[in-house]
From Swiss-Prot:
Domain of life of the source: Viruses
InterPro entries noted in UniProt: Gp5_OB_N (IPR009590), Gp5_Vgr_C (IPR054030)
Predominant localisation class: virion
Descriptive protein name: Protein Gp5
Role according to the record: Tail-associated protein of the baseplate hub that is essential for viral DNA ejection. Involved in the tail assembly.
Length: 421
């Protein structure tokens, strides 16, 4: 059969079924003007179930092979479509496209040329074009008044009812304000979420919106060019005219990379986490900071190192502890100080040594004690002085069962009272 030689007919009609195609080819049942009555009873008309299955035509940029390309599903019950018959018996129909309009009445499912489910057209979109509101941008939601818009239409002052798309107001209302940055107090620096720069002009904003409310925009409006992907829950990604990107995720976010990931930021990086943050690296971590590192921990710091800790500080180390310091070392402690050590203790010093104590002083050793000085030796005590030995006191008393004092040089004992033995 050569199509057209035995007759060629166009048709226009309304989709009444798109969900029951057993072959799932995107076929639709269409009630056609002039061919089918608007009555749907078996006695006087044609029921929706008895209408032809109409094949959808797809564009040449769609493969329509093995699932490659866009699926031919997009029309809804109540959509006006047009096409042609491929046979003179009017049994093989093809749908070429859809016909938008301005719906005026709610659907009546009992009458043909209507959505049998009585859903489309929606009640809140009557008396306005089928063109998406984001593409039209008739009115700013901040100044929109439904009654005024309806009155203007009723009085013939407007060609249709102007209504804004609800996501503009919802996105503006949900913008995050005064997000705190890291600082030492609540009055530290803050920043705001960058608001949507939506300023579309008809006919430059190319919009695709699904039935549930998912949206994709390619806005070519001069000076307001955007890319926008929006999920019905409020999750979105929007690229602004200046190339900035805003991503907001209403639910959880998972990013899984099976190989490497590289992030290069030429400016600053700010991260604010309202809840907890967990970082787990199963191998090594290398950090290089060319400037300063500041940390402010309002709670506790708990570190557990299973191996060694090595710190190299090229300059000074300053620590200020306002309360107590407790250290427990299970093995040895070795300290090497190449210059001086200065300790100032305002209270007492208590040392308990389970083994021996040995001090080696190359230079002088001086002790200044303003109070009493008591030495208790459980065993023997030996003093060896290579040069002079001088003791000066108001009273000196050496008492013991046996005392030995060996002097290599001179010795001087001076006091008001000196008692030996």
């Amino acid at each position: 059969m050569f199509m057209g030689l035995d007759g060629f007919e166009w048709w226009t009609g309304v989709v009444e079924d798109r969900t029951t195609d057993p072959l799932k080819l995107g076929r639709i049942k269409v009630r056609m003007i002039g061919l089918h009555p608007d009555k749907k009873s078996s006695e006087q008309g044609i029921r929706t179930e008895e209408l032809l299955w109409v094949h959808p035509m797809q564009s040449l940029d769609n493969a329509a092979m093995n699932g490659i390309g866009n699926a031919p599903i997009g029309v809804v019950e109540g959509t006006w479509v047009f096409g042609f018959f491929r046979d003179k018996l009017r049994q093989d129909a093809v749908a070429m496209g859809v016909l938008p309009g301005i719906p005026e009445d709610l659907p009546n499912g009992s009458v043909g040329f209507n959505d049998p489910n009585e859903k489309y057209p929606l009640a809140d979109k009557l008396n306005e074009p089928d063109t998406n509101r984001l593409a039209r941008n008739d009115v700013d939601p901040d100044v929109y008044d439904e009654s005024q818009s309806q009155t203007a239409f009723d009085n013939g002052e407007a060609p249709y009812v102007y209504r804004p798309h609800p996501i503009i107001a919802s996105k503006r209302a949900a913008e995050e304000k005064e997000i705190p940055l890291a600082g030492y107090n609540a009055e530290g620096p803050k920043y705001d979420e960058k608001g949507t720069p939506y300023a579309a002009q008809y006919p430059y904003n190319h919009v695709r919106e699904s039935e549930s409310g998912h949206i994709h925009e390619i806005d070519d409006t001069e000076g307001a060019e955007r890319l926008h992907t929006y999920h019905r829950t409020g999750t979105f990604e929007e690229i602004h005219p200046d190339g900035s990107r805003v991503t907001k995720i209403i639910g959880d976010d998972f990013e899984i990379v099976h190989k490497n990931q590289n992030v290069y930021i030429k400016g600053n990086l700010n991260i604010t986490v309202v809840g907890d943050a967990t970082f787990y690296c199963q191998q090594n971590v290398t950090q290089q900071i060319d400037g300063d590192l500041k940390q402010h921990v309002k709670g506790n710091v708990d570190q557990h190192v299973e191996m060694n800790v090595t710190q190299t500080v090229d300059k000074d180390v300053t620590q200020v502890v306002h309360q107590n310091v407790t250290q427990t070392v299970d093995m040895n402690v070795t300290q090497t100080v190449h210059q001086n050590v200065t300790q100032t203790v305002d209270g007492d010093v208590n040392q308990t040594v389970g083994g021996n104590v040995q001090s080696n002083v190359t230079g002088d050793y001086t002790q200044n004690i303003s109070g009493n000085y008591t030495i208790t030796v459980g065993g023997s005590m030996s003093e060896s002085v290579s040069s002079s030995y001088t003791r000066s006191a108001a009273s000196i008393s050496d008492d013991g069962g046996g005392a030995t004092l060996n002097l290599a040089g001179s010795a001087a004992l001076d006091g008001t009272t000196v008692s030996l033995g």
